[in-house]
């Protein structure tokens, strides 16, 4: 009889635990987690909302909303030397490849060319960082940037760059930052190639 009671108690205990599982839905705040978003308005092939990881300890915050500004691929792509397409970049947002020099140096080059912000991305698909966000940190120099900078997933950067080149476009048009605070996660127009 004691064994029967123990079996019954164990069964009830398991069923109570199973029925008291708490399900917490994922909110937009969980997704945002301090990141910044921008949307591409044109060309239509790129009309999605993209996520950036802001620079950790240099540059300014993405506090001013920029609407309909050009997103321009820098020349040279890594922006470690003087930017040659400053005329196209002036008043826009720089799209810069990672590597060869510090994130701060790239941001300072973009700022000197008249950019209002810098977006840095991994361009090498075989890099271990290609599908991850990178914490962009200060290079411990005596300099600092006065424009915001953020890191874009490599896959997004490669697709944006290749689409603009295929369409022979100098730039895309973007809004940055985009406030998603009250947008349900299912309504965020994320790029289909990411699957989040």
Curated annotation (Swiss-Prot):
Domain PA stretches: 73-171
GO cellular component: a single term: extracellular region
InterPro entries in the cross-refs: PA_dom_sf (IPR046450), PA_domain (IPR003137), PRADC1-like_PA (IPR037323)
Pfam families the record matches: PA
Example GO biological process: muscle cell fate determination
Residues bearing attached sugar chains per UniProt: 179
Keyword match Glycoprotein: yes
Name of the protein: PRADC1-like protein
Organism whose genome encodes this protein: Drosophila melanogaster
């Amino acid at each position: 009889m004691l064994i029967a009671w123990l079996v019954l108690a164990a069964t009830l205990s398991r069923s109570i635990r199973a029925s008291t599982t708490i399900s917490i839905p994922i909110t937009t705040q969980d997704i945002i987690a301090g990141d910044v978003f921008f949307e591409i308005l044109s060309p239509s092939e790129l009309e999605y909302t993209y996520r950036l990881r802001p620079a950790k300890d240099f540059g300014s915050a993405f506090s001013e909303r920029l609407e309909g500004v050009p997103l321009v691929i820098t020349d040279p792509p890594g922006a470690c030397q003087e930017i040659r397409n400053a005329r196209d970049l002036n008043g826009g947002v720089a799209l810069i490849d990672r590597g060869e020099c510090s994130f701060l140096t790239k941001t300072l080059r973009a700022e000197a060319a008249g950019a209002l912000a810098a977006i840095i991305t991994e361009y090498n698909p075989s890099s271990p960082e290609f599908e991850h966000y990178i914490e962009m940190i200060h290079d411990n120099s005596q300099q600092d940037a006065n424009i915001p900078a953020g890191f874009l997933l490599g896959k997004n950067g490669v697709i944006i760059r290749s689409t603009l080149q295929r369409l022979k476009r100098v730039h895309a048009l973007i809004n940055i930052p985009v406030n998603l605070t009250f947008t349900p996660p299912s309504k965020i127009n994320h790029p289909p190639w990411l699957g989040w």
